[in-house]
A protein has these predicted regions:
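Structural preference for solvent-exposed beta-strand-turn elements
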Residues: 1-171
């Protein structure tokens, strides 16, 4: 067993994926070679069994680390505001809030009244047309700020947890 934090585990996963890509590239480049009939072939240094076993070994480590992270995320609660939430529920909630924040951001940037653009169909109309918002702009702005603040507090709690909470990973 090895002790890791989520932050460290993600760095290890990045390294393992880089290593795996190295062996996948080696496999891709070493599978075949071209040689002219009248010259000595230059055979790439490639051993299927060695490369395949390295890839399988790396994949096994990745599975163990990701499983440990998933268990930690599903079973450990973090205080966020005045409630406790599991890490995985925080991640889901943050995704929901970020989508809502994008909608509210678009709404809060609208003008209360805008003139419609003239186009081919509007060219014959004498009176200009206006588009009006159908909501309270200040309320939307406040809701945007509230959601932004909620996301920030979740992110801070999550960052602290990821940097400090240690868990066991099977080696």
């Amino acid at each position: 067993m090895a002790k890791m934090t989520s932050a460290y585990a993600n760095k290890v996963l990045k390294k393992l994926n880089d290593d795996k890509n190295y062996y996948l590239n080696m496999e891709e480049e070493g599978q075949v070679y071209v040689a002219a009939v009248d010259e000595e072939p230059v055979v790439p240094d490639y051993d299927y069994e060695v490369v395949s076993s390295k890839i399988a070994e790396i994949d096994e480590k990745i599975v163990k680390i990701k499983h440990a992270i998933n268990v930690v995320n599903a079973t450990n609660k973090i205080a966020v505001g005045d409630s406790d939430m599991t890490v995985d529920s925080i991640l889901v909630r943050m995704a929901q809030l970020n989508k809502r924040k994008m909608v509210l951001d678009k709404m809060r940037k609208r003008q209360e009244k805008t003139r419609e653009k003239y186009g081919y169909l509007n060219a014959r109309k004498a009176a200009p047309e206006y588009q009006y918002i159908n909501y309270d702009l200040k309320l939307v702005g406040k809701e945007y700020e509230r959601i932004d603040s909620e996301i920030a507090s979740m992110q801070i709690a999550l960052d602290k947890f990821n940097q400090t909470f240690e868990f066991d990973v099977e080696c």
